[in-house]
Amino acid sequence: MACMEIDPGKEDAEHQHPFEQCGVVVEGKIEMFIGDVRRILEAMDTYFIPAGVLHGWKTFDVPARILDVSAK
């Protein structure tokens, strides 16, 4: 489990893991790319990333804080 604080205007390249991942946006706004689905998430929105699925994210003009859990 990790609490990630991400600065505005950042982007994570598309990647994948051999384990499931999920989390909740604590504050701010972030766009998540999970497989072919793109979602804009704000405070209290949750996400789930199945094992082996390509995913990534980008922030907007405000920072984002997310609580992220990896099921290794």
Which residues does each PLM region occupy?
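Short coil/loop residues immediately preceding or within conserved phosphate-binding loops
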Residues: M1, E20, D61
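A short glycine-rich, His/Asp/Glu-containing loop-to-beta-strand
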Residues: M1-E14, A71
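Short, conserved beta-strand element in jelly-roll/cupin
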Residues: E5-D7, H17-M32
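Short histidine-centered beta-strand/loop micro-motifs
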Residues: D12-H17, K58-T59
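Structural motif
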Residues: K29-E31, R38, L54, P63
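Short acidic-glycine-tyrosine-enriched beta hairpin
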Residues: D36-A51
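Ligand-binding loop in jelly-roll beta-barrel domains
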Residues: A51-K72
